[in-house]
């Protein structure tokens, strides 16, 4: 197996070779089951780096326990300005203490592990998340229900998985803290060919609006069966709805609280076109990695101008213009702006919705 200490230094950019050039460390899988995701990270970050004149240091992320120390050694030795990627929580546990000593921020594009972030805040590790926290999802869902579903009979349904139960529990707690008690809380059996019994149970209870914490296919089956039973349910799912529209197509008008497709953002239109022109489809982690590289370049300038460590500037809430819009971090090192938005399925794609009601 190739040593994790092996670095690939990419030069030849506009400002590459300059002693003062900022540099970005790209930590992402180069082989194995996550190679495709790692390729998306590299494509996005390197495209932005070429445009911005960043030197690039690529390090393989094996996602194995105990691999973070060697990765940290490589990043520190290369004196990168910022390290981005980190698709695996296993990497971060050991990589963060050395990066703290070197004042190198680590920006993860995917890790949502709450315990890791708790440790990072406790020990002052420079971990920042472009991936939204689980709390951000439940907060936005509860906010929308409180705004749009007051006066209706509300049902909350989970699929029995830990993630779904915890999501629905957080939503219910937030609703009840704000004086809105759901009429029904239920657990469904996922991965079934039909959900007629659940749909009829909701109807008997008088439920008109229901949030379903389940995979997209399960929600699609509920919507299909509600339609066949002529039961007018307003259905809303969470971030799990951002998935392939098969094997059961999702009915039009089903709602979801999820992140918009990055390439549909107004701030991303030009870059998405440039990437497609270069043969790179702006999907998955491509645009988040591009944004992380933009943030790296702007942060390097701010660090020099303010004579402050980069992690301190990030933790201070400074906003940076990126392909994903203005990005900054709150004191918990999460995104300061909740990226989840209410969307409605139009039969082909999700589109922004102003209100969580059927049309």
Regions found by a protein language model. Give the residues of each.
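Extracytosolic ligand-binding ectodomains
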Residues: 2-10, 21-359
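N-terminal signal peptide c-region/cleavage motif recognized by signal peptidases
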Residues: 16-19
């Amino acid at each position: 197996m190739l040593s994790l200490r092996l670095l690939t230094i990419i030069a030849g950019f506009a400002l590459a070779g300059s002693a003062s050039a900022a540099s970005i460390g790209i930590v992402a899988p180069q082989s194995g089951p996550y190679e495709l995701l790692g390729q998306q990270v590299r494509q996005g970050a390197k495209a932005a780096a070429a445009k911005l004149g960043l030197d690039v240091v690529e390090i393989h992320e094996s996602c194995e326990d105990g691999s973070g120390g060697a990765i940290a050694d490589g990043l520190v030795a290369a004196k990168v300005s910022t390290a981005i990627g980190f698709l695996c929580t296993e990497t971060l546990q050991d990589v963060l203490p050395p990066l703290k000593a070197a004042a190198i921020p680590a920006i993860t594009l995917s890790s949502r592990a709450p315990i890791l972030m708790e440790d990072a805040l406790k020990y002052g590790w420079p971990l920042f998340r472009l991936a939204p926290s689980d709390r951000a999802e439940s907060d936005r869902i509860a906010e929308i229900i409180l705004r749009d579903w007051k006066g209706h009979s509300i049902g909350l349904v989970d699929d029995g998985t830990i993630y779904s139960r915890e999501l629905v529990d957080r939503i219910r707690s937030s609703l009840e803290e704000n004086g809105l008690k759901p009429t029904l809380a239920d657990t469904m059996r996922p991965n079934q060919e039909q959900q007629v019994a659940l749909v009829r149970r909701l109807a008997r209870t008088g439920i008109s609006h229901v949030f379903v914490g389940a995979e997209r296919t399960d929600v699609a089956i509920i919507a299909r069966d509600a339609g066949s039973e002529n039961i007018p349910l307003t259905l809303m799912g969470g971030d799990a709805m951002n998935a392939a529209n098969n094997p059961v197509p999702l009915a039009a008008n089903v709602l979801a609280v999820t992140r918009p497709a990055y390439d549909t953002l107004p701030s991303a239109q030009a870059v998405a076109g440039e990437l497609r022109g270069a043969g790179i489809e702006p999907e998955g982690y491509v645009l988040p990695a591009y944004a992380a590289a933009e943030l790296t370049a702007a942060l390097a300038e701010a660090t020099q101008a303010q004579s402050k460590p980069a992690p301190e500037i990030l933790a201070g809430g400074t906003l940076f213009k990126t392909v994903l819009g203005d990005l900054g971090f709150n004191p918990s090192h999460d995104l300061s702006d909740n990226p989840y938005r209410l969307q409605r399925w139009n039969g082909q794609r999700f589109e922004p919705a102003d209100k969580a009601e059927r049309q």
